[in-house]
């Protein structure tokens, strides 16, 4: 069956997922596609494994930015697609192949239908980690092309195709990685009194961490601690000398993030004393909350409702993390959910976005960009 150009691009990208700052093949694909366009009014830069493209407007007064994240996840794909990932153990399980395709579609429209204002497209690496938005924003490559307004999107499996969802103000949570390493004293399983068991210490720690949210965060201010991975020990008859906990922290306010981390540190100090061990806490990457500019978001929602065939709804804030929040901290703009009607959710090995969304998104976003970019 013949598919449209942009559906094929999405499938091409889906085959080659790459993790953060290793998206060399993806970067080359983007550059090769850009090379097929008329470049009379186009400038292109690379930044690490990302790509920054500027389309010069006819009579620019501002720069409008569109950000698309391009990285995949370390997940083994189970979609059954004929165009499934050819990179073992990696998958586009968060829809970044769709985000990038929509960006290339918008770029194509922008080249053929120039508007007054300049447009900048940020094909950003490493959203899933260690975080590409902040260093890209601070880079020399972007300095002279820094947008005055910026927008981004994220696919939403739970919404139907043709639906977008967003809200003014807080949309996504503050997030932080969490790594805790415990080191005690190993020994023979027959002589537990001579050792300091880090499996037991880790078990106590996981249990105690559950009280951080329930007894330290205002119930009206949501927060979540998730421990997603525990490692420790070597074989069944040796008391473990080391253990490691890996997880995430998510809060809707910066104040709650500080409070949660303070309580984690106090609990870990107690574990050190109780089990006579050493502990190291590493918060890894932290993503700033996604906070939509109220006026721009309201204006966008009204435009979509009145002038496109898309259905726009007001959603509630989510505990999702997104490094686009760093861009919105410095640049007025917004992010929205784009419905893709998938039975399976984000970060699932069977995620299958409905490809019908690609042309719809390119069309309505092109309408919005033209409207916004030709207004004086």
From Swiss-Prot:
Catalyzes the conversion of N-acetyl-diaminopimelate to diaminopimelate and acetate. The keyword RNA-binding does not apply. Keywords: Amino-acid biosynthesis, Diaminopimelate biosynthesis, Hydrolase, Lysine biosynthesis. Pfam families: M20_dimer (PF07687), Peptidase_M20 (PF01546). Coiled coil: none annotated. This is N-acetyldiaminopimelate deacetylase. It catalyses: N-acetyl-(2S,6S)-2,6-diaminopimelate + H2O = (2S,6S)-2,6-diaminopimelate + acetate. It is an enzyme of class 3 (hydrolase). The lineage of its organism: Bacteria, Bacillati, Bacillota, Bacilli, Bacillales. Disulfide bonds: none annotated. Gene3D superfamilies: 3.30.70.360, Zn peptidases. GO terms for biological process: diaminopimelate biosynthetic process; lysine biosynthetic process via diaminopimelate.
